[in-house]
C-alpha cells in the first residue's frame, strides 16, 4: 500500500520490494530514488506487521526469501488501524497488512499491483481467487489431530466450519476458497484422511488449484 497522493507508483516488482525490505537495506535504501532511479528523491516511510505476526512471517519469506528477515527501521504494529493511519497520513509511505483492512479503508489508501514475474497484478478478490496475485496471497488452514476427531464435539465443529466457512469468511472481508475445496475437505474428514500437502515445509506462491491437486494424492 502507498499513500493515495503517490502518483508515480503504479506497480512494483518483487525485486524492488526486496530491495526495500531486506535487512541490508537499512541505512542504505532511504528514498524512492534509491530503489528505482526513475522515481523521485523522496524519503520512504515504511509501515508493516510486527514480528510476532503471521503476516510478517509470510511477507518476509515471500519477498526477502527468508521468514523474519527484515530491516528493522520501520513502524511495526499488530494493529492494522495504526498502519492504515500511518500510510494515509504520509505521502512517502509504503506498507503492508491484511487485505481486509485495505477493503475497509480503500478511500484512504492506494493498492499497488505486484509483478511476480508475469506482469503487474492488482490485489483484487478476483486475482486472489484465480491464483494470479502471487506471491502475496496465501491460504489459511485449520489442522485437527486424529485423536481430537474422536471427540464428537470436535468433529461436529469441524463439519460446521467447513459448511459455514465461505459466507463467514466473506463477512470479515477475507476471500473464501473455491466451493470444491470445502467439499473435498469434508470428504477427507469423513474418510479420516491424514496428512498435509506441505510435507512439513513452508511454501510460497502456491495456488489453491495446485494445493487441491496435491491433496487429491493424499
Would you name each region that the model predicts?
Residues 1-218:
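Flexible loop/hinge segments at secondary-structure junctions
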Amino acid at each position: 500500500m502507498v499513500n493515495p497522493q503517490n502518483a508515480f507508483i503504479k506497480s512494483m516488482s518483487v525485486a524492488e520490494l526486496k530491495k526495500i525490505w531486506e535487512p541490508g537495506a537499512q541505512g542504505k535504501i532511504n528514498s524512492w530514488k534509491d530503489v528505482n532511479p526513475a522515481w523521485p528523491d523522496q524519503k520512504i516511510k515504511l509501515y508493516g506487521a510486527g514480528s510476532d505476526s503471521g503476516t510478517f512471517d509470510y511477507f518476509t519469506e515471500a519477498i526477502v526469501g527468508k521468514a523474519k528477515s527484515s530491516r528493522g527501521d520501520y513502524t511495526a504494529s499488530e494493529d492494522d488501524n495504526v498502519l492504515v493511519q500511518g500510510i494515509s497520513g504520509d505521502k512517502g509511505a509504503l506498507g503492508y497488512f491484511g487485505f481486509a483492512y485495505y477493503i475497509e479503508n480503500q478511500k484512504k489508501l492506494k493498492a499497488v499491483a505486484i509483478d511476480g514475474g508475469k506482469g503487474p497484478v492488482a490485489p483484487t478478490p478476483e486475482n486472489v481467487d484465480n491464483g494470479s496475485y502471487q506471491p502475496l496471497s496465501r491460504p489459511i488452514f485449520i489442522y485437527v489431530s486424529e485423536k481430537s476427531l474422536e471427540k464428537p464435539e470436535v468433529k461436529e465443529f469441524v463439519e460446521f466450519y467447513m459448511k459455514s466457512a465461505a459466507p463467514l469468511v466473506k463477512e470479515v472481508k477475507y476471500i473464501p476458497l473455491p466451493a470444491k475445496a470445502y467439499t473435498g475437505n469434508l470428504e477427507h474428514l469423513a474418510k479420516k484422511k491424514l496428512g498435509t500437502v506441505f510435507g512439513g515445509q513452508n511454501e510460497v506462491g502456491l495456488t489453491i488449484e495446485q494445493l487441491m491437486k496435491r491433496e487429491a494424492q493424499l
